[in-house]
Amino acid sequence: MVGQIRDTFFFDLDGTLLPLDMDAFLEAYYIGITKRGVCESIHITDGMEMFQKAVYAMIGNDGSMTNQQAFFETLEALSGTTMEQLMPLMDDFYAGEFKTIKNCTYVEEDAVQTVKILKEKGYRLVLATQPLFPQTATNQRIEWSGLCIDDFEYISYYDNSHYCKPSPGYFTEILDKLDLSAEQCYMVGNDARDDMSAMALGFEGYLLTNHLIGEIGKVTGCKKGDYSELLNLVKNLPRI
């Protein structure tokens, strides 16, 4: 929509607002949750493969169910363990061992200041993280970043999402819930494919070059820069 003011920022979390060693994070996550979430008779390697397939089921979700439902439906079929049996085990993992994964992350002050300035200027903020996790896991990662859940008007979790990035449905679901148009929004993220796919809908993209995933040369039409450049950009934005 020509002339519409962009007053909303969608932010990715992992690798964007929360800098992290993605390989170390995923390894610790899959090993930890597999030990907690499958029965002892299943070998750890087989269990990790089951959890990975359940995650892929969420990534490929067609919108017919929530990501949470896609995850547990797949895991139940592969492991023979019901959701009712799995949930307490996974809750224990997120309440305990998951917290140690914080060691794979750190606080980026420029990212914290970026969010703070946007809030002060009146912009609406959405945490558009890949919705593969329950609320407790996502909320903990927000805290690890130096931010808090109240910084955001909306946060995507696996139980309130029916798609994953880069599906257009992921973005349109949030837009519809918040009565927004894509032309009102920026998308900030470090993934050249998943995050910048929002531009096809009308978002303005900012590809964060720190912790970049994908090939920067294949993305055109968006702003590109590191944390300090992003901070300078928002400092120069008008108040809403």
Residue positions per predicted region:
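A metal-dependent, Asp-based hydrolase signature
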Residues: 52-95
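Substrate-recognition element of Asp-dependent hydrolases with the DxDx(T/V) motif
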Residues: 92-94, 102-104, 111-143
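Residues at alpha-helix caps and immediate loop-helix transition turns in enzyme cores, especially N-
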Residues: 22-25, 107, 137-138, 167-170
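Hydrophobic alpha-helical core bundles mediating ligand binding, dimerization, or RNAP-core interactions
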Residues: 26-34, 48-55, 72, 90-98, ...
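Active-site neighborhood of HAD-like aspartate-dependent phosphohydrolases
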Residues: 2-50
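Asp-based, Mg2+/Mn2+-dependent phosphohydrolase catalytic module
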Residues: 1-9, 116-117, 130-132, 139-240
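Short histidine/acidic/glycine/proline-rich micro-motifs that form metal-
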Residues: 17-19, 57-58, 129-133, 160-161
